[in-house]
């Protein structure tokens, strides 16, 4: 394939709307809603990447969004990548056990699982960042994440989660343009590295404020502390995710798989 400047092209797509920051903020606020918000955002990003893969130039929709379709697309994506996510989670767990003697036992209830996932990710980022294996692990994760994004787009194209598990087909696409795939994964790795630095910095600030506020029972202060940490993290990771989906959508154009199935979000 002719060399494509995926990052600059994806950025140009995102910022075509002068109010693109509003879109990022909207998605970031949705990210604060556990499970339902996450599924909807995944579907939104998948639908935008699908449009890009079809050759449509334009920013993600900010108005007249088909909320139901984005949620359905998110459900398809989750179904199409759930097993891949389990493999990734197992890999990260092994890494965490390698760099730490601490055990990790998730709670069974729904809120406990969400809380455990957050603490697991926080522990992985903070502890692995202190280890010499951090960058190699980040490289593997970046390659794998983009594999899952391709799987999610395959599921969106076919409107069938089973398409996300056609590993042979996905690997065949990667083999046909390995350089492009590595190019995108390298930029994903850099973006994730920056995102993790932001996560670590904000977590340290939040931890310091929690220590300073021990004994304070003011609910307003607790909400402020929550937003001060979670919203900036959500903004950073939302931007990274949008850019990654856009770059993969651009990469998939060459295979002409998307057709013209869905012209709007």
Give the predicted meaning of each segment.
Residues 31-54, 85, 95, 121-165, ...:
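Selective recognition of hydrophobic, aromatic-rich stretches within alpha-helical transmembrane segments
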Residues 1-24, 57, 62-66, 70-135:
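Long, highly hydrophobic alpha-helical transmembrane signal-anchor segments
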Residues 2-31, 64-87, 145-198, 245-246, ...:
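Interfacial aromatic "cap" segments that immediately flank transmembrane helices
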């Amino acid at each position: 394939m002719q060399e494509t400047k995926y990052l600059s092209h994806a950025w140009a797509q995102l910022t075509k709307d002068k109010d693109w920051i509003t879109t990022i903020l909207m998605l970031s606020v949705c990210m604060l809603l556990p499970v339902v918000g996450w599924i909807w955002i995944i579907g939104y990003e998948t639908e935008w990447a699908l449009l890009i893969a079809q050759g449509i130039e334009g920013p993600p929709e900010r108005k007249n969004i088909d909320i139901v379709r984005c949620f359905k697309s998110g459900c398809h994506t989750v179904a199409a990548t759930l097993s891949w996510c389990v493999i990734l989670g197992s890999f990260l767990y092994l890494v965490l056990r390698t760099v730490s003697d601490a055990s990790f036992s998730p709670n069974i209830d729904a809120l406990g699982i969400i809380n455990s996932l957050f603490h697991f990710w926080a522990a992985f980022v903070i502890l692995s960042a202190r280890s010499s294996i951090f960058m190699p692990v980040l490289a593997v994760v970046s390659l794998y994440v983009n594999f899952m994004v391709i799987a999610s787009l395959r599921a969106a194209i076919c409107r069938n989660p089973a398409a996300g598990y056609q590993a042979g087909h996905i690997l065949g696409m990667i083999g046909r343009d390995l350089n492009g795939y590595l190019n995108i994964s390298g930029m994903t790795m850099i973006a994730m590295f920056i995102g993790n630095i932001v996560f670590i910095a904000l977590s340290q600030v939040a931890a310091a404020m929690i220590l300073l506020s021990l004994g304070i029972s003011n609910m307003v202060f607790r909400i402020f502390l929550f937003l001060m940490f979670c919203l900036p993290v959500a903004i950073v990771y939302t931007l990274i995710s949008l850019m990654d989906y856009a770059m993969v959508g651009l990469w998939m154009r060459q295979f002409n798989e998307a057709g013209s199935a869905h012209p709007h979000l």
